Amino acid sequence: DATKLDSSDKLPQLFKEQDICLLHLGSGNHKFIKGINKLYHTFEPIQERTEWAYKKSLLNEYNDSESNILSVANNQRILHDFVFGRDLEFENLPIQKRPKTYFPHRTKTTLRYSFENEQIIALNQQIEIDLTLEFNAVVAIFEAKNGTLKDFNIYQIYHPFLYYYSSNLPLQNIICCYLLRNENSLKFFAY
């Protein structure tokens, strides 16, 4: 399944040797691309480390799904702190003025974009969004993975970005975030 190639480590050895990978075109169609680094982004070193006062809850470690990683980080208010800053100022605000959380979902849409001077039209492209936060017309989309990855396939956050960017909603900014969980640590990347 080509959609499971979310890290270049998962590419077949022949692909690595030939420096090729797959670009999703939607409806089960793909295009071979020369240059793995064109579709996979290497994670940057973490520049700022924050110790968080973890408050264990009953279900926090009951399962290790990607959705649960996001739920734990959300319930601990880590996601809001990472994207919008400490949310103590929201304590007295009515709910409609507080940051909103939208949990994992899939949707289909047609995406149009340029890649290497070629117009790509991905018809009926399925997009999976692990989590979305929204506050004051700023949207943050999240992809989450368990384990240590060296890189990720850009489409995992670019397709959701393009979905919201093309929406004609009055958005001020779209932040693409990647969250990695490795045992007791969380690493956040924003693009």
Where are these predicted regions, by residue range?
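Active-site metal-binding core of divalent-cation-utilizing nuclease and nuclease-like domains
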Residues: 90-132
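Conserved catalytic cores of phosphodiester-cleaving nucleases, focusing on short active-site segments
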Residues: 131-146, 160
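Short, charged/polar micro-motifs that form catalytic or ligand-binding hotspots
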Residues: 59, 63, 121, 143-151
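Nucleic-acid nuclease catalytic cores
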Residues: 140, 145-152, 165-191
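Nuclease-adjacent, charged terminal/linker segments that flank catalytic cores
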Residues: 1-68
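N-terminal, charge-rich interaction modules
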Residues: 42-106
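Short, well-structured alpha-helical interface segments that form or flank functional binding sites
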Residues: 64, 68, 124-126, 137, ...
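Hydrophobic, Leu/Ile/Phe/Ala-enriched alpha-helical segments that form helix-helix packing faces
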Residues: 1, 11, 15, 73-77, ...
